Design a protein with these regions (language model features):
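Glycine-rich phosphate-binding active-site loops on the catalytic face of alpha/beta enzymes
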Residues: 7, 82-94, 132-145, 189-195
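Conserved N-terminal beta1-alpha1 strand-loop-helix module at the mouth
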Residues: 1-71, 112, 120-130
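Short secondary-structure boundary segments
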Residues: 58, 88, 116, 137, ...
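Active-site-adjacent beta->alpha loops and helix N-cap segments on the catalytic face
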Residues: 13-19, 39-49, 64-74, 89-105, ...
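Conserved, mostly hydrophobic/aromatic
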Residues: 7, 40, 76, 136, ...
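Catalytic-face loop-and-helix region of soluble metabolic enzyme cores
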Residues: 137-140, 167-170, 174-177
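Catalytic cores of alpha/beta
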Residues: 117-129, 176-194
């Protein structure tokens, strides 16, 4: 699984997200690689018609109803998303919300991509059986220095911590991934994909 988190960059604003979805669909089909796109929420409807996995960048553990401004899983699912990032380093949430969201999204049959910053979090949260755990050391995010070269031991330790949970959770890695070599190294170290 390769996840493209679009964040809120201008390069994907408006119809530019459609171009990204078309290219991702083509690459996914050609190389038989699942590709997910996590666009800003208001752009979700523009890409759900393409054959790519669509993830919300964040969802809130709030109720349906009088919750203005919150991203409610049951409501956002109707936009045809396939899952959500949870606890991204740029939008960390408390442990209780993490646990509740994973349960809630599982009930809704949505993929859960739980972001962690270290091995301790990986061990703790792997027991919740999210679809994926993505290890992203915050000090490498946005630096162009890849986890697979700067801290390869974190990937192997995270792989081991996920395996200890003895469930179906798979490990992804992120932070500073900028080249095909970074991806290849991460996969050789046991990562099942990239965020």
């Amino acid at each position: 699984m390769f996840i493209i988190n679009c964040k809120n960059y201008d390069e994907i604003s408006g119809d530019k997200i459609v171009k990204l979805a078309k290219i991702s669909q083509k690459i996914s089909k050609k190389y038989k690689i699942p590709i997910a796109i996590a666009p800003p929420h208001h752009l979700i409807p523009l890409i759900t018609k393409f054959n790519v996995i669509v993830l919300a960048q964040h969802l809130d553990d709030k109720k349906i109803g009088s919750t203005t401004g919150f991203m409610i899983p049951e409501i956002v699912k109707k936009s045809k998303i396939n899952g959500s990032l949870i606890n991204h380093s740029e939008h960390r949430i408390p442990e209780k919300e993490i646990k509740n969201l994973i349960k809630r999204l599982k009930r809704l049959k949505l993929k859960t991509v739980l972001c962690v910053k270290n091995i301790n979090e990986s061990k703790k949260y792997a027991k919740l059986n999210p679809t994926f755990i993505a290890i992203e050391p915050p000090e490498l995010i946005g630096t162009g220095r890849a986890i697979s070269t700067e801290k390869p031991h974190l990937i192997t330790k995270a792989v081991d911590s996920v395996k200890l949970a003895k469930n179906s959770t798979k490990l992804l890695c992120g932070a500073g991934i900028v080249s095909g070599k970074d991806v290849t190294r991460a996969k050789k170290l046991g990562s099942k994909g990239i965020l």
